[in-house]
């Protein structure tokens, strides 16, 4: 297919990244978004190292231009897509493959939602570029060492799991150390390992001296062992979904209908696992390609380490978001290999278009004008003073539910989307605008005048 069609698709991707989030009911604001914003607002007097400072710091920098943390975070997401696409095109760095990659579920989810994974994937992309230049164009010396080491630091400053990618290059180095074809790369690669390790260790030391913990481990919840059986099942399903570039549906509760959906999705996951396996089995030249082997080792290392982390820390279940950093190098390596093969390129192009449209629609679910609601809520709180808390006091009111109809069998079921409830959305808008306000889970504050109640927001 002509490059022009990929350019058009990229512009569609960029257009979607700019406008689609405005029609998502919650605007892309999730619980972690509020944590990032609170950290950003507290700079330089930061009290927590639960999250690294990189993403909140950039939010704070853009806040000086927008005076609105929501739009600051949204600009970061848009710029990530813009820079990746423009850089790929002008540097001729796998442009077609990059456009396909930007259509996968991980980028749609991580860009439309205001989370640090979007920025992380962007930094990871540029890191891969430098390694590719190092292996294929003999880019050596400090022109490779310094930017690569700084990108490793940027990964770690964005997400602590960036250390998993650092561990991946250690494994990559050990695997290839004795290979004759790796001889010319040893010295510079080793210097990158040392310098990057120094940068990461320096930030860990900063955290330890200022917060008493290296990577926020002393501020995380302990592992809930009461539901370990269900957690294992859900995490297993999440891992099996890692190789699926299109579908990442994850119901919050198990019902007879959602179990059927999970079984159907599981079968599709198996198909994608087989297709990727067959792709690599048929094209064995990848074994001598350092870029692809680096991507695969990064994917596998990240997956293993995040699974281990899940069983020792109270982090999220292994869903699309948590596994995006593992899916990313796997997808990119498979897409590169696909384009190097004699397969019909129209197939992957139209699958990418479908993925973009489907995942955008999946996140929207029920189209709403988030920016309009944001303006309405902010107008109601603009003159409120001495407010310190937000509390949802209408939890007993029937929550909004969406009806889903199943074709063929002519059945329907209702599903309650937690992030589409009015009180939840309003609370996120309020706290993102006024980070000094804290969310109350229980109405325990005696001074009711300091509380914004959800029932007060019309």
Task: Describe these PLM feature segments.
Residues 86-107, 121-122:
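Transmembrane-helix signature of polytopic, membrane-embedded enzymes
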Residues 37-41, 350-413, 420, 434, ...:
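Membrane-embedded, lumen/periplasm-facing catalytic core of multi-pass transferases
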Residues 99, 141-146, 150, 170, ...:
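Signature aromatic-anchored transmembrane alpha helix within multi-pass, membrane-resident enzymes
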Residues 112-120:
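Short acidic/glycine- and proline-prone juxtamembrane loop motifs at membrane-interface regions
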Residues 53, 57, 65-83, 110, ...:
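Loop-to-helix entry region of an early transmembrane alpha helix in multi-pass inner-membrane enzymes
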Residues 25, 187-273:
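Membrane-lumen/periplasm interface segments of specific transmembrane helices
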């Amino acid at each position: 297919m002509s490059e022009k069609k990929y350019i058009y698709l990229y512009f569609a991707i960029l257009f979607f990244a700019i406008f689609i989030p405005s029609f998502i009911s919650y605007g892309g604001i999730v619980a972690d978004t509020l944590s990032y914003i609170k950290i950003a607002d507290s700079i330089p007097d930061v009290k927590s190292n639960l999250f690294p400072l990189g993403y909140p710091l950039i939010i704070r920098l853009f806040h000086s231009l927008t005076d609105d943390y929501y739009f600051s975070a949204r600009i970061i997401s848009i710029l990530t897509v813009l820079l990746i696409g423009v850089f790929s095109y002008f540097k001729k760095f796998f442009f077609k493959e990059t456009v396909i990659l930007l259509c996968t579920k991980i980028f749609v989810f991580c860009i439309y939602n205001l989370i640090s994974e979007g920025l992380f994937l962007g930094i990871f992309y540029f890191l891969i570029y430098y390694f590719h230049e190092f292996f294929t164009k003999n880019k050596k010396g400090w022109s490779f060492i310094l930017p690569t080491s700084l990108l490793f630091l940027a990964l770690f400053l964005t997400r602590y799991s960036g250390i998993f990618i650092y561990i991946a290059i250690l494994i990559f180095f050990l695997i290839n150390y004795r290979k004759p074809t790796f001889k010319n790369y040893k010295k510079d690669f080793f210097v990158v390992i040392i310098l990057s390790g120094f940068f990461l260790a320096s930030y860990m030391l900063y955290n330890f001296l200022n917060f008493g913990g290296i990577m926020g481990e002393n501020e995380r919840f302990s592992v809930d062992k009461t539901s370990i059986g269900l957690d294992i099942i859900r995490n297993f399903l999440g891992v099996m979904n890692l190789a699926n570039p299109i579908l990442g549906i994850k119901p919050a509760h198990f019902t007879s209908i959602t179990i059927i959906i999970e079984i159907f999705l599981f079968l599709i996951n198996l198909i994608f696992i087989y297709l990727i396996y067959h792709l690599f089995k048929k094209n064995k030249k990848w074994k001598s390609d350092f870029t692809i082997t680096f991507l695969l080792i990064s994917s596998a290392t990240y997956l293993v380490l995040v699974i281990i982390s899940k069983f020792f820390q109270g982090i999220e279940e292994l869903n699309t978001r948590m596994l995006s950093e593992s899916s990313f190098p796997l997808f990119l390596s498979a897409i590169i290999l696909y384009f190097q093969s004699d397969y019909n390129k129209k197939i992957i192009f139209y699958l990418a278009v479908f993925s973009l449209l489907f995942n955008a629609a999946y996140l929207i679910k029920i189209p709403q004008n988030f920016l309009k609601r944001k303006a309405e809520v902010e107008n109601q709180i603009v003159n409120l003073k001495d407010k310190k808390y937000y509390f949802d006091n209408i939890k007993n009111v029937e929550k909004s539910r969406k009806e889903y109809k199943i074709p063929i069998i002519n059945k329907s079921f209702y599903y309650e989307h937690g992030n589409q409830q009015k009180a939840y959305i309003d609370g996120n808008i309020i706290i993102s605008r006024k980070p000094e306000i804290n969310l109350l889970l229980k109405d325990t504050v005696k001074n009711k005048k300091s509380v914004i109640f959800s029932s007060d927001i019309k």
